């Protein structure tokens, strides 16, 4: 019986063994699928809004919704790219020496899948609401206001998920499994920790609504684009250093 079970035990041990290379392709695949699903949805949502043009609604209303939809998609792609680049850089530099690092990687990828689905749900619900209000003949101001404020709970949940993902990446970099890359891993740990903290603060954008305001401080898509722009400026030096490190390793 032990002889017959030996191949199965060897297979299970192989699956449980920590190996960074086993994660590389999976990481690329998960982030690519998330981006693809969101990209496929964009034309359908845009066409649903455009189909309401003959409802005698101001073209500026349709244009405003389409522009904000494009802003949200752009912000989403930038965030997914940033998550992917930090995740893969940390994994490539640190390697994996412990089973708990595999669990951390799995949690990050699971949140990526959930996040992509959550974004699609938010945009679908916003588009459906806008179509209903346009067909009902509501004013331009009401349509745009409801578009921005609709799905507040889902948007906050999305920001908190991103914060958790960056926090998990910080823990992954903190393991410093590769002693030759301690300096780079420390920089990545610090950056991901700061990003996690910033995304924990972003839900404060909706704080005025608790005190009677009808809108948040700013549309969340625009806030994330501003964050991305500032992030790219501040992290240019780190990116150059990591690029040189990866070139040297190859």
Q: Which sequence ranges carry the predicted segments?
A:
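Multi-pass alpha-helical transmembrane bundle typical of ion/small-solute transporters
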Residues: 2-250
